[in-house]
């Protein structure tokens, strides 16, 4: 039986693109919108799409030649005016040809074209584009978001910095070129568990040029800092899930330095890394056509009447009907066997744990040394303060600038054995931690151990001594994301955690409300 042939239409933001996919890519035609000055204006981008749509579609259909079996289009997320042009074009064409219509999630399409090209079965995916920066993995029918930007997408941060210095759009490739002649200067490095924030980094980069630092040095340091943040959270997802494949997708992923850094991280961990070629990295019709094809084969078409665009369509809202595997993940009840986490190696003796923070080959040495020393000191201070506050934590035996010797805890790591009892226990412990004026910073189930009928916390490298509500909310957000991405009953576990948290901490309700606000920030921006 011949392969189905699907026409895909991409039009979420800056590029109007159409492609036909069968067994392989048949053809791809694009007409990108380039603003004369500044960034992308949604109305002007939509006007551009409307003016080029007929020509782009005609070229794709003429080159494809044979009959089209379905029309797929990017239904969201994206800029509303641009999405509506693509959707109207797709509906009209589907009706004219008498073929099914398929609404494709733009972010998931980036993931699927990456899986198709690399042949990786179940990877962790770093998706870095203008408006989106996410770390994703598949579990039980959905792409789960392990971490994402809490303010601005990486590509938009690069573009805004470039525009502030009168560089043309898009700014990323120009920054990449200028960075090749630069040297490292310190800029803010903001990782919150597996989440990221780029606005402070962007502002600091602007200030650095204003005080006389060269553009080459600032571009180099902006890239090195932002990319190291992305690679770190990707490694955290690898370490937490036990997966062994990484794919880089999205327009920013075309950057050679980001690819080099991810490849180095994976080499050090014994994981595999690949990125699709440049033609599949930025927004393109091929990814919509391919994802539309596998959705068609799974029966996931959409009636015309229900094909309303969704500018805020999240990756984790998509029912992935075309994948029949559950997604590889650590099995419940499995014992901890790994002696290397995302940041450190762990050596066990009869009574002690020796935690050694490892140099990262993907980070520039100056940044790497700074983070290792800073996080080792922060961890030792936080554990000692938490213990004084009555929080269940291991006893510190000795500390150097890169190593901590602490009490060995015999018990189960919660990521393998999480249940309602343990979730409530985690809530009690975190409530005590916040009451003591400490936030953890990396509150995942990898960093919780059930020991002596209580939940103990470990790995305080991202901790803060603070009573501010924002970092407390981030703690809860990181944990809730972890539960959503790695458990089958996250709502039940979150409810149990909240019960324990409220019992231990009088300000719990305010923090829970802040966590919800933080959750709403992690959207298409």
Swiss-Prot record:
Top-level taxon in the UniProt lineage: Archaea
Names of the cofactor(s): Fe(2+)
Keyword entries, A-Z: Acyltransferase, ATP-binding, Cytoplasm, Iron, Kinase, Metal-binding, Multifunctional enzyme, Nucleotide-binding, Serine/threonine-protein kinase, Transferase, tRNA processing
UniProt GO BP: tRNA threonylcarbamoyladenosine modification
Active-site residues, record numbering mapped to chain: 442 (proton acceptor)
Molecular function per GO: ATP binding; iron ion binding; metalloendopeptidase activity; N(6)-L-threonylcarbamoyladenine synthase activity; protein serine kinase activity; protein serine/threonine kinase activity; protein serine/threonine/tyrosine kinase activity; zinc ion binding
UniProt GO cellular component terms: cytoplasm; EKC/KEOPS complex
Residues binding ATP, per UniProt: 338-346, 355
Region (Kae1): 1-322
Cofactor info, note text: Binds 1 Fe(2+) ion per subunit.
Domain Protein kinase span(s) in chain numbering: 331-525
Enzyme class: transferase
Intrachain S-S bonds: none
Catalysed reactions, as listed in the record: L-seryl-[protein] + ATP = O-phospho-L-seryl-[protein] + ADP + H(+); L-threonyl-[protein] + ATP = O-phospho-L-threonyl-[protein] + ADP + H(+); L-threonylcarbamoyladenylate + adenosine(37) in tRNA = N(6)-L-threonylcarbamoyladenosine(37) in tRNA + AMP + H(+)
Compartmental location: Cytoplasm
EC number: 2.3.1.234, 2.7.11.1
Residues the entry annotates as binding Fe cation: 106, 110, 127, 283
Matches recorded under NCBIfam families: arch_bud32, arch_KAE1, gcp_kae1, PRK09605.1, PRK14879.1-3
Record text on subunit structure and interactions: Component of the KEOPS complex that consists of Kae1, Bud32, Cgi121 and Pcc1; the whole complex dimerizes.
Function comment: Required for the formation of a threonylcarbamoyl group on adenosine at position 37 (t(6)A37) in tRNAs that read codons beginning with adenine. Is a component of the KEOPS complex that is probably involved in the transfer of the threonylcarbamoyl moiety of threonylcarbamoyl-AMP (TC-AMP) to the N6 group of A37. The Kae1 domain likely plays a direct catalytic role in this reaction. The Bud32 domain probably displays kinase activity that regulates Kae1 function.
Family stated for the protein in its record: In the N-terminal section; belongs to the KAE1 / TsaD family.
Name of the molecule in the record: Probable bifunctional tRNA threonylcarbamoyladenosine biosynthesis protein
């Amino acid at each position: 039986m011949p392969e189905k042939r699907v026409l895909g239409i991409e039009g979420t933001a800056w590029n109007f693109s159409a492609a036909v996919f069968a067994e392989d890519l048949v053809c791809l035609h694009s007409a990108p919108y380039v603003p004369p000055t500044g960034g992308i204006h949604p109305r002007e981008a939509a006007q551009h799409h409307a003016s080029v749509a007929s020509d782009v579609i005609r070229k794709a259909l003429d080159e494809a030649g044979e009959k089209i079996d379905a029309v797929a289009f990017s239904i969201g997320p994206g800029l509303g005016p641009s999405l509506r042009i693509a959707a109207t074009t797709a509906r009209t064409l589907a009706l004219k040809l008498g073929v099914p219509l398929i609404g494709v999630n733009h972010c998931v399409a980036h993931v699927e074209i990456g899986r198709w090209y690399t042949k990786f079965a179940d990877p962790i995916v770093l998706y870095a584009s203008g408006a989106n920066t996410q770390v994703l993995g598949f579990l039980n029918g959905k792409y789960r978001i392990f971490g994402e930007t809490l303010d601005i997408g990486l590509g938009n941060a690069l573009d805004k910095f470039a525009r502030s210095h009168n560089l043309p759009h898009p700014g990323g490739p120009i920054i990449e070129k200028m960075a090749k002649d630069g040297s490292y200067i310190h800029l803010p490095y903001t990782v919150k568990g597996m989440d990221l924030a780029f606005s402070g980094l962007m502002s600091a980069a602007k200030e650095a040029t204003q005080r006389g630092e060269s553009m080459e040095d600032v571009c180099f340091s902006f890239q090195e800092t932002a990319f190291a943040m992305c690679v770190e959270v990707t490694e955290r997802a690898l370490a937490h899930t036990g997966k062994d494949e990484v794919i880089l997708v999205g327009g920013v992923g075309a950057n050679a330095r980001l690819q080099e850094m991810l490849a180095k991280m994976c080499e050090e961990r014994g994981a595999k890394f690949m990125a699709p070629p440049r033609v599949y990295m930025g927004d393109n019709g091929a990814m919509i056509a391919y994802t539309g094809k596998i959705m068609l084969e799974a029966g996931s078409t959409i009636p015309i009447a229900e094909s309303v665009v969704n500018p805020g369509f999240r990756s984790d809202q998509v029912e992935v009907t075309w994948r029949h595997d559950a997604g590889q993940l650590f099995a419940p009840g499995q014992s901890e066997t790994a002696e290397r986490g995302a940041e450190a190696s762990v050596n066990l003796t009869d009574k002690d744990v020796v935690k050694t923070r490892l140099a990262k080959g993907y980070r520039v040495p100056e940044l790497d040394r700074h983070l290792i020393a800073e996080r080792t000191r922060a961890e030792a201070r936080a554990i000692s303060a938490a213990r004084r506050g009555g929080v269940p934590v291991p006893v510190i035996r000795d500390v150097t600038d890169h190593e901590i010797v602490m009490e060995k805890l015999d018990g189960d790591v919660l990521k393998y054995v999480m249940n309602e009892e343990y979730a409530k226990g985690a809530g009690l412990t975190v409530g005590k931690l916040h009451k003591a004026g400490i936030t953890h910073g990396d509150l995942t189930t990898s960093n919780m151990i059930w020991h002596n009928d209580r939940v103990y916390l470990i790995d305080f490298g991202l901790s803060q001594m603070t009573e501010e509500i924002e970092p407390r909310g981030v703690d809860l957000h990181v944990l809730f994301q972890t539960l959503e991405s790695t458990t089958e009953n996250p709502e039940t576990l979150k409810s149990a955690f909240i019960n324990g948290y409220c019992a231990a901490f009088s300000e719990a309700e305010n923090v829970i409300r802040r966590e919800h606000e933080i959750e709403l920030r992690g959207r298409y921006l």
